[in-house]
Amino acid sequence: MSVTMTLGQLAEVLGATLKGPEALQITGLATLQEAGPTQLSFLANPQYRKYLDNSQAGAVLLKAADAEGFAGNTLVVADPYLAYARISHLFDPKPKAEAGIHPSAVVAEDAQVDASASIGPFAVIESGARIGANVSIGAHCFIGARCVVGEGGWLAPRVTLYHDVTIGKRVVIQSGAVIGGEGFGFANEKGIWRKIAQIGGVTIGDDVEIGVNTAIDRGALSDTRIGDGVKLDNQIQIAHNVQIGDHTAMAACVGISGSTRIGKHCMLAGGVGLVGHIDICDNVFVSGMTMVTRSITEPGSYSSGTAMQPLADWRKSAARIRHLDDMAKRLQQLEKRVDTVTSGGLPTSEG
């Protein structure tokens, strides 16, 4: 789908100050390096400032300070990246699904599907499920018994919702995501693992986004819960009984063990792992590949592990780490000897 808007229209949408011709046609968005004369770009990161003067973009979203001295067309805004985020949807070429149920879809007789919803080819909607207004269910999706998908939801092809999953409004779920799979619960009987039925469900709030191949397990007794506005990247594992607070964001490959609770407005970078049964307070940032082994009670930034270094240096550091315990013992012995020498009856300035 091709979209064209004028600079004047974009300025009105954003409440921006326009420097340039209102009638200039904008057909899309691109980076400063790649944008052409009918495309809009933006400068949000100072490290890309070097590309601004030579950009061929038809116009650029800029802060007032960056717009000073720039000869090209500009839309001056307080936050160029946020402005870009807002107008990106105007130029999104994603196909719009048409309302209706595809003939190949299998829909239970007692399932409730709003007339404005779109149900794609070979989708399955089981007994008691409810699909809200303007929901789009992609091809080959599975919606289990008694699931609820709130209005405006968008499920890409091959999303799986097991039974008793409740999805809020305007939720986006990407392909391969599995919501409501059985949690990893077993009891050990003399070395043999006995399965524990996972009889809870999953409850997901409004405006949540769930990435490709992410798994959210159902609760053992009560629901696993994802708060409003949570953003989950690809290949994240959320175990049974986990609770995630509103507007928390997680990058790819985060793994959260069972019954851990994460607060609101937290950010977990890629590859972070959390053990089970801990609490993370609000407004916490955890850097990539950190292993969180205990509760965090104070807002702030946290890290673990070692940063990248040349291989030879890393090998030396690793070798030293193996000897830390022995070195600590030797240091304690040395401190005792120093104390003995310095306090062994020698004269002092007061003696």
Curated annotation (Swiss-Prot):
Enzyme class: transferase
Entries under Pfam families matching the protein: Hexapep, LpxD
NCBIfam families (alphabetical): lipid_A_lpxD (TIGR01853), PRK00892.1 (NF002060)
UniProt protein name: UDP-3-O-acylglucosamine N-acyltransferase
Annotated source species: Pseudomonas putida (strain ATCC 700007 / DSM 6899 / JCM 31910 / BCRC 17059 / LMG 24140 / F1)
Keyword Repeat: yes
Role description: Catalyzes the N-acylation of UDP-3-O-acylglucosamine using 3-hydroxyacyl-ACP as the acyl donor. Is involved in the biosynthesis of lipid A, a phosphorylated glycolipid that anchors the lipopolysaccharide to the outer membrane of the cell.
Gene Ontology BP terms: lipid A biosynthetic process
